């Protein structure tokens, strides 16, 4: 302990079992290859259950039928979730056609799920289809490496820019950062792609033999949009432009939303500003942040292992100085930037190159053929004729990019006929949920299946109080891990038990303030009763342009969270 920082740089003590597992895994190989051939179980055993996460998969089961199968003396219906690595959410139409085919033919649920980390997931991959899915991805230039567990996960990049040139530059950096921080082990290629074992020894110069202490998330942000919710992420590069050209980044470190119910040592935290850096130092700084967290992060307690806790333990200035030392730079003062919103601009938007971009609202990001709304088939038909790319947004929507004027009518016709352009309220456009039941093993309450009817009720309240043309950033997450990013919403519901949620208020529209718990463990009717009263007050008492979250703070309904590490639970 020194006087410079509040706690030790390295936490001494017994390492978690996850650290043992990583060390003994032979650079993430484990016995996954052998386990694949075990037909006695539909799942992976022992360490492999966790090791497959480094390869982009989670083992799950259908919780709707878990009890029924137990009664029949059957093991749970194991199936894998696979998450693709897709920096910035950009996917070609050729790649889309391949994933559409796989989802339809080789998954239990037949759907493609767009996520709020700008990628897609397959749910319900049986063990026999696990190797084929990796080979299918590889055949179209994709992979699932490092999209889960203790790695730098899928790198986000603002997807609805006002200037296409700036987006192109920022997207290139998102890709470079993603590639630079990837694990170097050949385990992925050996196990899934049948590449030969090479005699050389594996090395992980950046991540190390035991990888990172915990998950690590990175973004590239183009103000004034904060669509990627930078404060939910460990490392954020905020684009600074001069005359429409990218010149450098402001770096913000240490955001994160995951908490544990009732555990006051856990907290959501907004990211801290470190300073400005010119473009040429980007990769060195990214590596320095990651290696500092690698060496200083807490490996004795996974609930205290994220970058946000390291920053609070050692102090922001100490961490920043170490990043400067490792990167061989001095940060310049933060350059001015501001955010004005987080939502996607649904519908047609003209780019600066005379091409058009069509943003399609996809409720909960779930792409499936619904009765009367064949979303999946519609997108496949568009993918067959569209010459540009698709872009997945951090709001779980899809952008068809680079549509020339001559193709606009054709694409719009397919989109309308497939239900991809059905009109929805501003409120629905600004609401989001994680997957939760039936596939997520951590789910405590419904989220994706709860949201549509819940928003019907909220729409009725908005109409009742004369604010139907307005919106409140509203999010539901099925457990406190926070994948639905409810802890950056104006109204956040965090699942507590079946049918029960903690209601959080006081975030803001631009995603720079953590909401505080207003009521604990309440039901949907209780939530709606509270919001009925509060939306009524907001409609009558708000100032010009004042969002719901800002109103709840100004009116004294909720105390703002100013320093989450210390006052979130007050």
UniProtKB/Swiss-Prot annotation:
Family annotation (InterPro entries): CysI, NiRdtase/SiRdtase_haem-b_fer, Nit/Sulf_reduc_fer-like_dom_sf, NO2/SO3_Rdtase_4Fe4S_dom, NO2/SO3_Rdtase_4Fe4S_prot, NO2/SO3_Rdtase_4Fe4S_sf, NO2/SO3_Rdtase_FeS/sirohaem_BS
Manner of cofactor binding, per the entry note: Binds 1 siroheme per subunit.
Binding site for siroheme: 483
Required cofactor(s): siroheme; [4Fe-4S] cluster
Record keywords, A-Z: 4Fe-4S, Amino-acid biosynthesis, Cysteine biosynthesis, Heme, Iron, Iron-sulfur, Metal-binding, NADP, Oxidoreductase
Residues binding [4Fe-4S] cluster, per UniProt: 434, 440, 479, 483
Catalytic activity: hydrogen sulfide + 3 NADP(+) + 3 H2O = sulfite + 3 NADPH + 4 H(+)
Gene3D superfamilies tied to this protein: Sulfite Reductase Hemoprotein, domain 1
One GO MF term attached to the UniProt entry: metal ion binding
Pfam families: NIR_SIR, NIR_SIR_ferr
Cellular component per GO, a single term: sulfite reductase complex (NADPH)
Record-level GO BP terms: cysteine biosynthetic process; hydrogen sulfide biosynthetic process; sulfate assimilation
EC number from the UniProt entry: 1.8.1.2
UniProt keyword Heme present: yes
Pathway the protein acts in: Sulfur metabolism; hydrogen sulfide biosynthesis; hydrogen sulfide from sulfite (NADPH route): step 1/1
Quaternary assembly: Alpha(8)-beta(8). The alpha component is a flavoprotein, the beta component is a hemoprotein.
NCBIfam families the UniProt entry points to: CysI, PRK13504.1
Protein family membership: Belongs to the nitrite and sulfite reductase 4Fe-4S domain family.
Function: Component of the sulfite reductase complex that catalyzes the 6-electron reduction of sulfite to sulfide. This is one of several activities required for the biosynthesis of L-cysteine from sulfate.
Protein name: Sulfite reductase [NADPH] hemoprotein beta-component
